[in-house]
Amino acid sequence: MKLKERISWLMGTIQQSLFPHLDECLPVPLTEREKHLVKILELIQVEKFVPNCASRQWLGRPIKEREAIARAFVAKAVCKYQHTSSLRNELQSTPNLRFICGFARRRDVPSEATFSRAFGEFAKAGLGVVVHDALVKEHLGTELIGHVSRDSTAIVGREKPSKKIKRAMVAKKKGRPAKGDIRQPPEPKRLDLQRTQSAEEAICLLPSVCDRGVKRNAKGYTETWNGFKLHIDVNDCGLPLSAVLTSASVHDSQVAIPLMKLTSGKVDYCYDLMDAAYDAAQLWEQSRELGHVPIIDRNPRRKEVVPMAPHEAKRYNERTASERCNSRLKEDFGGRSVMVRGPQKVMMHLMFGLLALFADQLLKVTGC
């Protein structure tokens, strides 16, 4: 079954079976916003991937339903609640939202502390990445994707930037080495090491602590921020395929090879589209080695730049999908309202937003 047919069948089932059932159970008819939330939750089905839940608990104090809490966090991203306290207040005051998330009664809504503990458990288990990988493989695993656009976006953190530890540099002797003198070879570059590493190994070696980032925006002005960088691969339709969180100071090119390998393990695609920050020989070679065609804007490096061929320039214009995805994540799905600390929790917060964005964009693309 093709992607559009599969999504249309699912939405038709929801319209014919689920919505009438919800209207019978709820005191107030569902609003359009609530119906949209139901569609997104049914498309993601985050509750299937929750590691610890009451139905599978055998020992210890009974835990609150983690499935309902996970659905509530997705609702938080969709409905643009900045704080967990705002989400909890809305769950207590709105029966429809409470029922959609999975809380039968008002007293079933857990405390803020329970929400916080559950969020920490989800972050530690990498729930967001697991659900996102499953979504991409289920809906796009059999599709041939034309272009994958790769870019990063600044994520402002809520913590102090960590201090960089300066490495002790050993002074080298100047001039030619003496006869019989053996000098240590230079350390291999990170990009060269990444070519022989798996994606998981390369990502683990990238720094992810909160620090200070600097970049030049589209208008040529320099911007600085404290926090992180989220590196995302996006297809032509604006669907995020892979995401990696690093420190703000990490250069974009240092994450490209792990992202290529991650995305290549999920979907088949033809072209890698990247801006001038990714213009490195190792990236061109890695893209070709994986069976893709790299189209990377050339970095002048004080030299005269040869312009792209017309057909390459036309394909490169598809890279705006990445910018639209970054913008939607920040404006519509909580990318600007990071209220947690630590890379694991920040990634979990952003992944809830990316899950909601993936489902919302999938509904738009298929016209459902």
Regions found by a protein language model. Name each.
Residues 58-67, 222-223, 340-350:
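Structural motif
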Residues 341-368:
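Charge-patterned, long linear interaction tracts outside catalytic cores
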Residues 1-51, 364-368:
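Charged, often Cys/His-bearing segments associated with DNA-binding zinc-finger transcription factors
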Residues 31-79:
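Basic, short loop/linker segments at the boundary and entry of helix-turn-helix/winged-helix-like folds
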Residues 112, 116-289:
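Polybasic low-complexity intrinsically disordered regions
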Residues 276-340:
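Helix-centered, glycine/charged polyanion-binding patches within enzymatic domains
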Residues 62-130:
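Short, positively charged, Gly/Tyr-enriched micro-motifs
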